[in-house]
Regions:
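Short recognition patches in nucleic-acid-associated and regulatory proteins
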Residues: 5-16
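Conserved alpha-helical substructure of the radical SAM core
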Residues: 17-32, 36, 48-164, 168-178
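Terminal RNA-binding accessory module
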Residues: 39-40
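Radical SAM/AdoMet-radical enzyme domain recognition
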Residues: 116-133, 142-252
């Protein structure tokens, strides 16, 4: 229930070419939520459902049942498809849109031992984790950054990702070259929101156009696998979706 958050029964219905979830709470009555605006697409994605793969190890116990518990409890029927490791709270930007509230002075860097423990836990849970993403804050400013990557690559992780705003990659070519040494099965998950200064100022608090261009130029030169990651805000930069996709398709990396 959107009012009391009680777990209630629901059903999926097709109506006016859209897909809705109808819910009824004994206390707060009926509610209706749009979950897809394309019925054929909704039907098609259900073809990609696959049997669950449970984790090898659980980390918490079940107290209240889903969705009220937090953590990898025995109620989980699916393993971690992608695990995010937040190695630091700190960042070299102060983005107004940041859900973590990161900044140059907020929080702390996790110690290398803490991070190793986090990575070891993932391996215990998964044996061979599919994807692990090194994130933050801004992970490239961590004083033990390359030691973190070295340790992660020593583990049976199938694919490693680096979530970054690209500032370090743009400003330090030798740093970027060193990243290339972690390929294959290594990817840059690069923040890229807009081509417009006004949008970047609102989302990131800085004009990062030249930084982004230089970062992509360096990554193209190295042919280092890169995914552009867009924070979309309705009415602000959603008109740029097509332009960003076209730009991405033109890049070597």
């Amino acid at each position: 229930c959107p009012e009391c958050l009680r777990r209630i029964d629901a059903k999926i219905v097709f109506e006016n070419d859209k897909v809705y979830m109808l819910k009824r709470c004994p206390e707060h009555g009926k509610s209706k939520v749009l979950i897809a605006d394309d019925i054929p697409y909704y039907k098609n994605i259900r073809n990609y459902n696959k049997p669950s793969e449970t984790p090898y190890k659980f980390n918490t116990k079940t107290d209240y049942g889903c969705p009220y518990d937090c953590g990898l409890c025995p109620d989980h029927e699916q393993h971690s498809c992608l695990t995010v490791i937040e190695v630091t709270d700190r960042c070299n930007l102060t983005c107004p849109t940041c859900y973590a509230g990161s900044s140059p002075t907020y929080g702390r860097h996790r110690t290398l031992d803490e991070i190793k423990t986090m990575l070891d836990t993932i391996v215990l849970n998964e044996k061979e984790p599919d994807v692990v993403q090194i994130s933050g804050g801004e992970p490239t400013i961590h004083p033990d950054f390359f030691a973190i990557l070295d340790y992660a690559k020593s583990l049976p992780i199938r694919h490693l990702m680096l979530n970054t705003n690209g500032i370090k990659i743009a400003k330090d070519k030798e740093f970027a070259k060193k990243l290339k040494g972690y390929a294959p099965d290594f990817e840059i998950y690069l923040q890229f929101d807009s081509f417009e200064n006004s949008v970047l100022q609102e989302l990131r608090g800085a004009d990062l156009n030249e930084i982004r261009k230089q970062a992509i130029e360096n990554l193209n030169e190295l042919n280092l696998s890169t995914t552009l990651v867009v924070t979309l805000q309705k009415g602000l930069n959603d008109h740029e979706i097509g332009k960003i996709i076209e730009f991405a398709l033109q890049q070597k990396c």
